[in-house]
């Protein structure tokens, strides 16, 4: 059996974190946890888990590793620990696929679909500057787009604020047309009081879904909100464990779950969440605004899950809109995009060859990313 012998971590600006595992047979596996604004903390968590549980152990025993990393401590769950587990889990799957010369989707039971429809994130914070990008991506064949819609918003805000949000989205709908799915991200910025008003104002635009219509800490109120609107509701970017998704699905109120392969327990975690979603007739739309390793892992899970709606694609993976992080950090062209769909890499493991020289050149101890702090007119902190 191949044994894990070594690991390295690389933080790449603006907010990417990569984990490299190596076995005694020379197989290298890559994982991509997410540091967000806390990459140094996630890094420390990974180091602790690797030293205490993984180095020197069987590289193929993925399920045992997952259970040990998750249940082996008295405290489990949360964004830091689950991000650390996610990166390790991805890298172990990459190793196992390479060991058996199989793509990861074959380790998950095989593909249920040949390709995944892409949902292209197009920005939209503060003021909606996304219409030009939307036009570009639709011209390129994309059939689903997602935009942020609410910037700073009070707990109880004015009719004019609601109207501005609706008008901005109406401009986007006019740009993309009715043959394109338009998803709206409220980013958890909206209070319970404002969410029904905004969802009602958006109903005539027929969005694919409204993402994080309320802050995830208040997801218990999603069934109440769902009963007040015809708009499908989505959440999951900031839900971290399969059991947390199970409780949310059992309560109802969510139409689309959006676990991140870099936050919700890696491939193992998101695979479980996808099965739970299918058992509740709920769609899966994996959330992956990160780099090529996580994107590949997400495609593998999404290709084998029963009810995948589409795969989110980050803005900086889009040609012509800044550096293409997929091209920057990979060798060759692991992803093919055609007619609004992404191919699933079919090489061994995750099917992505990381450009180690480029990665080492760009890596830092801490990527240095910090989320912005927004404030209301009175000086109080607003939700970003």
Regions found by a protein language model. Give the residues of each.
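Metal-dependent enolase-superfamily TIM-barrel catalytic cores that perform enediolate-based chemistry
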Residues: 115-229
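Glycine-rich, aromatic-flanked loop segments that form ligand/cofactor-binding clefts
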Residues: 89-125, 129
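Conserved, mostly hydrophobic/aromatic
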Residues: 4, 26, 50, 88, ...
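Metal- or metallocofactor-binding catalytic centers and their adjacent structured scaffolds
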Residues: 24-99, 318, 382-384
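N-terminal amphipathic alpha-helix/helix-capping segment at the start of soluble metabolic enzymes
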Residues: 1-14, 18, 98, 102-115, ...
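Shared catalytic-loop signature of beta/alpha-barrel
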Residues: 44, 48-49, 64, 206, ...
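Flexible C-terminal active-site loop/helix
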Residues: 6-9, 13, 19, 24, ...
């Amino acid at each position: 059996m191949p044994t894990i012998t070594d690991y390295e971590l690389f933080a790449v600006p603006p907010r990417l974190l990569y984990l490299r595992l190596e076995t005694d047979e020379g197989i290298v596996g890559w994982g991509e946890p997410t540091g967000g604004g806390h990459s140094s903390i996630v890094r420390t968590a990974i180091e602790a888990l690797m030293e205490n549980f993984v180095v020197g152990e069987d590289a193929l025993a993925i399920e045992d590793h997952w259970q040990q990393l998750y249940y082996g401590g008295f405290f489990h769950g949360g964004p830091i620990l689950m991000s650390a587990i996610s990166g390790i889990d991805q890298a172990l799957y990459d190793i196992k696929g390479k060991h058996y010369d199989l793509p990861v989707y074959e380790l998950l039971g095989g593909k249920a679909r040949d390709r995944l429809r892409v949902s292209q994130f197009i920005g939209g914070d503060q003021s909606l500057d996304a219409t030009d990008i939307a036009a570009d991506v639709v011209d390129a064949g994309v059939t689903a787009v997602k935009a942020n819609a609410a910037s700073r918003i009070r707990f109880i805000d004015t009719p004019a604020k609601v109207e501005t949000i609706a008008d901005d989205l109406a401009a986007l709908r006019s740009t993309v047309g009715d043959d394109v799915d338009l998803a709206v991200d409220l980013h958890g910025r909206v209070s319970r009081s404002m969410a029904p008003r905004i969802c009602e104002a958006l109903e005539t635009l027929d969005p694919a879904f409204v993402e994080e219509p309320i802050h995830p800490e208040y997801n218990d109120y999603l069934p109440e909100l769902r009963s007040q609107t015809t708009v499908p509701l989505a959440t999951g970017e900031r839900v971290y464990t399969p059991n947390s998704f199970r409780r949310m699905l059992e309560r109802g109120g969510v139409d689309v779950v959006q676990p991140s392969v870099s936050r919700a327990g890696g491939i193992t975690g998101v695979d479980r969440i996808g099965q739970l979603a299918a058992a509740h007739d709920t769609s899966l739309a994996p959330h992956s605004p990160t780099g090529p390793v996580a994107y590949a892992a997400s495609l593998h899970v999404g290709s084998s899950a029963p009810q995948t709606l589409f795969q989110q694609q980050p803005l900086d993976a889009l040609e012509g809109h800044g550096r293409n992080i997929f091209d920057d950090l990979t060798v060759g062209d692991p992803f093919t995009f055609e007619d609004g769909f992404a191919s699933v890499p079919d090489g061994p493991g995750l099917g992505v060859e990381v450009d180690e020289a480029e990665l080492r050149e760009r890596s830092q101890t801490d990527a240095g990313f910090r989320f912005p702090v927004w404030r209301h007119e009175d000086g109080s902190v607003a939700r970003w």
